[in-house]
Amino acid sequence: MPQVDPELFDRGQFQAELALKASPIAAFKKAIRLAGEVLDKRFRAGSDIRPLIEARAWLVDNILQQAWNQFDWGDQSGIALVAVGGYGRGELHPHSDIDLLILLGAAEHEQYRDAIERFLTLLWDIGLEVGQSVRTVDECAEQARADLTVITNLMESRTIAGPEALRQRMLEVTSTAHMWPSKEFFLAKRAELKARHHKYNDTEYNLEPNVKGSPGGLRDIQTVLWVARRQYGTLNLHALAGEGFLLESENELLASSQDFLWKVRYALHMLAGRAEDRLLFDHQRSIATLLGYSDENPKRAIEQFMQQYYRVVMSISQLCDLIIQHFEEVILADEESGSTQPLNARFRLHDGYIEATHPNVFKRTPFAMLEIFVLMAQHPEIKGVRADTVRLLREHRHLIDDTFRTDIRNTSLFIELFKCEIGIHRNLRRMNRYGILGRYLPEFGLIVGQMQHDLFHIYTVDAHTLNLIKHLRKLQYTPVSEKFPLASKLMGRLPKPELIYLAGLYHDIGKGRQGDHSEIGAVDAQKFCERHQLPAWDSRLIVWLVQNHLVMSTTAQRKDLSDPQVINDFALHVGDETRLDYLYVLTVADINATNPSLWNSWRASLLRQLYTETKRALRRGLENPLDREEQIRQTQSSALDILVREGTDPDDVEQLWAQLGDDYFLKHTAADVAWHTDAILQQPADGGPLVLIKETTQREFEGGTQIFIYAPDQHDFFAVTVAAMSQLNLNIHDARIITSSSQFTLDTYIVLDNDGGSIGDNPQRVKQIRDGLTEALRNPEDYPTIIQRRVPRQLKHFDFPPQVTILNDAQRPVTILEITAPDRPGLLARLGRIFLEFDLSLQNAKIATLGERVEDVFFITDADNQPLSDPQLCSRLQEAIVQQLQAGQGSDTSQTRVTF
């Protein structure tokens, strides 16, 4: 801490101002405000962070001493003002709590009551954010014995005013001789750390991390120092190095990492104007700029800053894990030496942990840096790596160079890991944590800590990749096989499961580089296969999977799967059933590893449908595609059989069907056609809109809720329908619009509730939906089609130009309208209003919400059911859509394309 800093606080000048004022409050406030401005100015100018937070603590020391001296304490031998917690360490950020202990020597302290109350009132009046307690020495001992937080705070203390002897008495009665011996304290702090990490999903890679509490945050460093203080009486990183728990290089890395997080936290407090430790989207751009990250693309600057953040917290996690494991080995060690068991000449087990047999193992036999992970996969009883061996790995990873990467012993060991029955994910994660994976695969090193500034990808690229491999492993286990039955079954019969793990490892490895990441990744995967001398068939499959890992999800979500041509084109692209099996499993794992909320029952159904129909096409032979007319005949024949069995007159059926057109029978199954037909024929002529609701499938974890509407066609039908569904809190995922020759509309919507599930067996909810839609369609003129809702906080920070593409389908008489835009409440209803204004008919729609953006595809025609052919009409349509999508946003540009 500075001994004196007149620019920050001049004692003489301050006391002179106090003497001139009737009330001290204004002088204190002015001093605090001016000092804060000085510190913020120094921060913006790039001053070192440590002197800044120490200077703020020094400032508060002076303010508190001056405030303390405003009151008559009489005999001061029995009272002291003590700083505890972070302030006790001499560290204060702009809005950190100032934790104070008013320490009393005896239980009888009535003489101080009035002065204490007036002192605390003054602190609040002058704007200090104070957390205070008033305790005697004995009360400190009593509460510290019962509360881990109290003993932790008291360990970090400084006397601000009053006799130091009181604090020394307090430290004596709360020492390890009286309570919380180091072993008990360590176990409690370790449990506290694990619980805190679990609160933040046990990952350093949250989209909006907490710089203090998240794994790898400042609290992890403090936990290590608290344990060290309890065990050794030391409370700084340099002293830890002196005790042998840290190398000097590790001490420097941990200190620089702490400084980086201090800068981020200081900036957060300064920008938020309050104690804010969450690195929210609201602040990420401003902090990136403040800390000097720049790019022509502001989004890229944020990603650069966050990648640095994630790499820093990963380093902190690694080093804190190492120190805590050292503590375990020292503090929890039994009296007698632990048992050892040899594994081979290079490694042995020590109390269940693997360790090197001598310090030069990795220097003499570098291949052991990969062998250790294979051994742990082959021996799942191994609990982990001994701390000294982790340090040896870190010290020798520089030996992993191009020669190492092409050594057949090393390439063979790496492939061997992927053939192990268990432990693949666990040991790849260890390799990444210890910095081995990124050294062995430099292309993987590029994606470590790399984030994408959106709500779709909730993990960094490396974390997502390892999550994907973890999900592939889970597909073999019963709990998830119930949720993913087809993927689990296929995973169990893949001829070479190691190939899907390798494809998963490389599927996103091209991200962050200029160009298509699938193509870049395929090139890297090809080089990997050649370096590891994989057979030609294996190499071709891995490269193909990397290159095409997005094709299946894109087809399922954006194409009309009822169109035989779509299925045939996809089957031609895939080529054979083996590739189809691998691609389906990889796609399921990829979606779930990207963001668990993306996986819903309807997406599961779409992928199953695409898989099943493609498999049929492949077995039928690609030279024998299913004919549209043949599919229509099959659907009608099967539906008629169902209806006749139920007693329906075939003539009535044929009369109705003659009005519906071919597309209706292509877009619906025979069971649905029979269900619709029976209900329509029983509907009274003046019965109003017919609204039917049922589940699309009885399979658990699949399907959605199908809403079928039959009513006289009207101009604003779609706009009113989607607005009503929005008000009913339904998310539309698919829409099929048919208009009969008798001018009735037959619309089918696939919807999910806000939680991503179908409506299910809920009669009250079904009635609410049916009544709400019926009322809206009976009185469309009274129904608002523009829904006003509050935009969620996170969505506000992802404002990008909408992309609108209009093109005519070469195979069908429709125009395809593709829209990518920020997700906003009521978006579909707004588009429905535009379709109404332009006299357009919607034939089909595929709706996908991916994090903060929507990717919607609409199949539209003009009023005569023809594709749009007027370029000026298309331009006006595009302009209207962009204006509507940009309403209330900051975007002023868009990307558009019109093709005929």
UniProtKB/Swiss-Prot annotation:
UniProt xrefs under PROSITE patterns: ACT (PS51671), HD (PS51831)
Annotated region described as Uridylyltransferase, given as residue ranges: 1-342
Cystines in this chain: none
Regulation: Uridylyltransferase (UTase) activity is inhibited by glutamine, while glutamine activates uridylyl-removing (UR) activity.
Record InterPro entries: ACT-like_dom_sf, ACT_dom, HD/PDEase_dom, HD_domain, NT_sf, PII_UdlTrfase/GS_AdlTrfase, Polymerase_NTP_transf_dom, UTase/UR
ACT domain boundaries: 706-784, 816-900
Transmembrane domains' residue ranges: none
Keyword Nucleotidyltransferase: yes
Family: Belongs to the GlnD family.
Swiss-Prot/TrEMBL domain comment: Has four distinct domains: an N-terminal nucleotidyltransferase (NT) domain responsible for UTase activity, a central HD domain that encodes UR activity, and two C-terminal ACT domains that seem to have a role in glutamine sensing.
Function: Modifies, by uridylylation and deuridylylation, the PII regulatory proteins (GlnB and homologs), in response to the nitrogen status of the cell that GlnD senses through the glutamine level. Under low glutamine levels, catalyzes the conversion of the PII proteins and UTP to PII-UMP and PPi, while under higher glutamine levels, GlnD hydrolyzes PII-UMP to PII and UMP (deuridylylation). Thus, controls uridylylation state and activity of the PII proteins, and plays an important role in the regulation of nitrogen assimilation and metabolism.
Protein name (Swiss-Prot/TrEMBL): Bifunctional uridylyltransferase/uridylyl-removing enzyme
Organism, as annotated: Pseudomonas putida (strain ATCC 47054 / DSM 6125 / CFBP 8728 / NCIMB 11950 / KT2440)
Gene label: glnD
